[in-house]
Regions:
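Bacterial N-terminal signal peptides
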Residues: 8-19
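Short, gly/Ser/Thr-rich active-site loops of penicillin-recognizing serine hydrolases
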Residues: 377-429
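A short, well-structured edge-of-sheet supersecondary motif
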Residues: 28, 32-61, 356-359, 363-367
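Active-site helix/loop module of the DD-peptidase/beta-lactamase fold
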Residues: 85-122, 144, 173-212
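Bacterial N-terminal signal peptides that target proteins for export
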Residues: 1-8
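Boundary at the C-terminal end of the N-terminal hydrophobic targeting segment
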Residues: 21-25
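Active-site SXXK
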Residues: 52, 66-91, 115, 165-169, ...
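Penicillin-binding protein/beta-lactamase superfamily catalytic region
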Residues: 179, 194-326, 332-358, 375-378
Length: 429
């Protein structure tokens, strides 16, 4: 067995089912595990802070690293700033109010919120390399997309839809999103080195493209944790705008506004009717075999499922999954039963294993970044267990008083959602 496959097996064993006994480890023990696992995953930066004080800071570079899809979460902050600045009246503003060409058909029903919650219903190819990376104007590509589901009716991760956000921000802010964020967030936070990929039309990408150092990404996380207040005490965003980022989406408990909501624990087991579902949808025998091999397993995360598929299928598992599962309209919930604990953290995550994790109860901000290399080995180098390990670190620490800013419980989420949706101007609540 190769070294990569051996480490993959170790990580998969951890991900399949995390023993509750691990919660009794000391913080020092968990930090040692994270440092060891971070090195095994060839991380370029692992930074963990508590109340802004580093607990672990291991880095091979201080240079900006491409955040991949974690860029989306920072894009959402720009929308929050538009609310604060009064340039966007409501998250439920129809996109057609900004782009009049959408006033016809079902597109007139798409709101800014739907773009942020992945519920727009716009046609989308799961693999960004197929359609998006070669497009000269990503805003126009999104505007021209067909509708494949009723807007607002279902969660479907959508790179194409998020590429419309930079266009919206530019029209409402009067400047490109990179310039807007530099003036309103980056410069006040001391972020001076960053890069943002642009399409041929000169528009910064929405789905990815932003590069930051681990420390600068942690500064974004600390701003979230502190409810919009910078380290020097300056308020950069309203606490309300910050809280909107992690309110549960109407169509998925996993997401807020382009931020992921992380439960303390989750378990996935194969549904008894999974084989029938796979056959009815025409899924290939090869992928059926890989999924049905999980019949007697319990997975502790979606990432563990993906690691299982990688082991079963090899290097081409991702395009196969995108074509056979996502492309046929199937979701994990169609094949696996799930259980999950209370939401205790939120995260910005990106391809290759870019992670920003915030645990409000213990005031932890954690970052893991890795540079893109030809030698990148999935699932080892993706370090998909990093968010779960940060939650485990938080659970190993003594309980603190409830934080002033955090993730609302179910009742709080419902109250906030109801209040937001019943007003034309959320920022004045």
């Amino acid at each position: 067995m190769s070294a990569v496959r051996h480490v993959a097996s170790v990580l998969l064993a951890f991900a399949l089912y995390c023993p509750f006994a691990e919660a009794r480890q000391s913080p020092a023990d968990v930090l040692a595990d994270i440092e060891r696992n971070g090195r095994a995953a060839h991380s370029d930066a692992v930074l963990i802070q508590k109340d802004g004080v580093p607990l672990l800071d291991v880095a091979s570079t201080s240079e900006p690293i491409h955040l991949m899809s974690a860029t989306k979460s920072i894009m959402a902050l720009a929308i929050g700033l538009l609310l604060d600045d009064g340039k966007l009246a409501s998250l439920d503003e129809p996109v057609s109010a900004i782009y009049p060409e959408w006033r016809q058909g079902q597109k007139r029903d798409i709101t800014v919120r739907m773009l942020l919650e992945h519920t727009s219903g716009l046609q989308n190819v799961p693999n960004a390399g197929v359609e998006l990376e070669s497009a000269p104007d990503l805003v126009q590509l999104a505007l021209a997309a067909e509708i494949t589901s009723v807007p607002g009716s279902a969660f479907s991760y959508n790179n194409k839809a998020t590429n419309l956000l930079p266009g919206i921000i530019a029209r409402l802010a009067g400047q490109p999103v990179d310039a807007y964020l530099e003036a309103r967030l980056f410069r006040p936070l001391g972020i001076t080195r960053y890069d943002w990929m642009k399409d041929e039309a000169g528009t910064p990408l929405g789905m990815a493209g932003l590069s930051l150092s681990a420390r600068d990404l942690a500064a974004i996380g600390q701003l979230m944790l502190d409810g919009g207040v910078a380290k020097d005490g300056t308020r950069l965003m309203s606490e309300h705008a910050i809280s909107l980022m992690t309110v549960e989406s109407a169509q998925s408990a996993d997401v807020g506004l382009l931020w992921w909501r992380l439960p303390e624990w989750e378990r996935y087991t194969l549904r008894k009717d999974a084989q029938r579902t796979l056959r009815e949808r025409g899924v290939s025998d090869r992928l059926q075999h890989a999924l049905l091999a999980a019949e007697d397993s319990t997975f502790a995360s979606k990432s563990a499922l993906m690691a299982h598929l990688s082991q079963q299928l090899g290097d081409d598992w991702q395009p196969l999954y995108a074509t056979e599962i996502t492309g046929r309209g199937l979701k994990i919930a169609d094949l696996f039963q799930s259980q999950r604990g209370p939401v205790s953290a939120y995260a910005a995550n990106g391809y290759l294993g870019q992670h920003l994790v915030v645990v409000p109860e213990q005031r932890i901000v954690a970052v893991r970044l890795i540079q893109r290399r030809e030698s990148h080995a999935f699932p080892v180098d993706d370090y998909a267990t990093f968010p779960a390990e940060i939650i485990r670190l938080a659970k190993s620490m003594p309980a603190l008083a409830a934080p002033a800013t955090g993730i609302g419980g179910a009742q709080d989420d419902v109250a906030v959602h109801t209040e937001i949706r019943s007003t034309a101007s959320p920022i004045r609540l």
